[in-house]
């Protein structure tokens, strides 16, 4: 982490509301945060606390109702859809709970879908090697375990060398041992690529592997915990 550098994200008073009048729901209620290059951040909080809305806003999948949201010099709060699409395509990798792989394509081909439309992308083989799937390049999703499919999804997300990697419950559909393998892949990518990595989870044990743990409650940041050192995923117990 480079605390003295300009942040990757500068966030001030970030607010997101859905609906209006009696049906208005405030998903984010004035979030202030700086997110730094190379950090690994774990977001915790109950369902409905604002974690996913926050991730969608910094990922350019949604826009805030009010407040400041800057990625480097780009004002995401004011960007039009074309600029947000360009931002997502170039700068952000997404990993979700469900893998969204194309069944008729091999692991290599699923990753290549991204490399073919990205600038400065790494070869699909290199991305799959980073998640230890070099021996599964030509396997189809149905021939892979759930954990292997999630690692293909991670390889697909990182092949464009994103500055930001956003993970929403990446181990939610996996057993403990498989989940640890997936977390090892995410940690390795964070360390080797230097991507700012944000992980949403309901599993508080993952907090130990983070640089910072940010807890959300009722659309606000409830607390921020700075870890003095990061635990290896293999040491986590849950």
Put a short name on every predicted segment.
Residues 1-17, 223-238:
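ABC-family P-loop ATPase nucleotide-binding domain
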Residues 7-216:
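ABC family nucleotide-binding domain
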